[in-house]
Regions:
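Small-molecule kinase domains that catalyze NTP-dependent phosphoryl transfer to phosphate-bearing small molecules
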Residues: 70, 115-122, 129, 133-134, ...
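ATP-dependent NMP and nucleoside kinases share a basic, alpha-helical "lid"
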Residues: 86-161
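Hydrophobic positions on the alpha1 helix immediately C-terminal to the Walker A/P-loop
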Residues: 19
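Hydrophobic anchor at the beta1->P-loop junction of P-loop NTPases
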Residues: 8
């Protein structure tokens, strides 16, 4: 049975990473969390004391840094220049800064090239904001996973490691992130015309994973 590539897109807090990881496990595929790559760049910039006023320096640092994604017992481990940043890149501070990093065309160009190289041999499940529209436009299966802002905030609140953040603040942050992602000039968040829309507000994680797996199986067996 030939391998395919699976593109999973959607807004912040939709559960893309968890679903993509579980789907990859079930298929025996490699999971690539593109959001973690943008978060890794954001973490590096914050370590360097760079912000949106230093775009030239940001691009220069991004070209030199080395990002590694490695499988771990509880999901993917992320390393920047040999330092593990798996937990560090999930902070609320990173959440609030990653959109402006992702909006820089040169940053996207660097990371998209890496992502396309990773997917060249097939057998990849990749999640992000523009996988089906830009990174892997020829992916055999494309899914756009979404849920209401309230549901996405509630899910993120359950998994947050920040003891200070409130549910209301998360809702506000997600709304802001949606606006930034949808309105950016380079590869905005948009559903690919040939993507399957999966509204998961009333669905369990297991139901979402099963739905995506069914789409993959239907394609491989010619049922699409």
């Amino acid at each position: 049975m030939g391998k395919i590539n699976v593109a999973l897109d959607g807004p912040a807090g939709a559960g893309k990473s968890t679903v993509a990881r579980l789907v990859a496990e079930q298929l025996g595929y490699v999971y690539i969390d593109t959001g973690a790559m943008y978060r890794a760049v954001t973490w590096k910039m914050m370590q360097e004391g760079l912000d949106s006023d230093h775009i030239v320096q940001v691009i220069a640092v991004a070209k030199q840094m080395h990002i590694e994604l490695k499988p771990g017992q509880k999901g993917q481990k992320v390393f920047v220049d040999g330092v593990e940043v798996t937990d560090a890149i999930r902070s609320d501070e990173i959440n609030q800064n990653v959109s402006w990093i992702a909006s820089i065309p040169e940053i996207r160009e660097i990371l998209v090239y890496l992502q396309q190289q990773m997917a060249a041999s097939k057998g990849i499940v990749m999640d992000g904001r523009d996988i089906g529209t830009h990174v892997l436009p020829n992916a055999e299966v494309k899914v756009f996973l979404t849920a209401t802002v309230q549901e996405r905030a509630a899910r993120r609140f359950k998994e947050t490691k920040d003891p200070v953040i409130t549910l209301e603040q998360l809702e506000y942050n997600i709304k802001q992130r949606d606006t930034l992602d949808e309105q950016r000039e380079v590869s905005p968040l948009i559903k690919a015309t040939d993507a399957f829309l999966l509204e998961s507000t009333e669905m369990s994680l297991a139901e979402v994973v099963t739905q995506v797996l069914d789409l993959c199986k239907a394609h491989v067996t010619g049922g699409n």
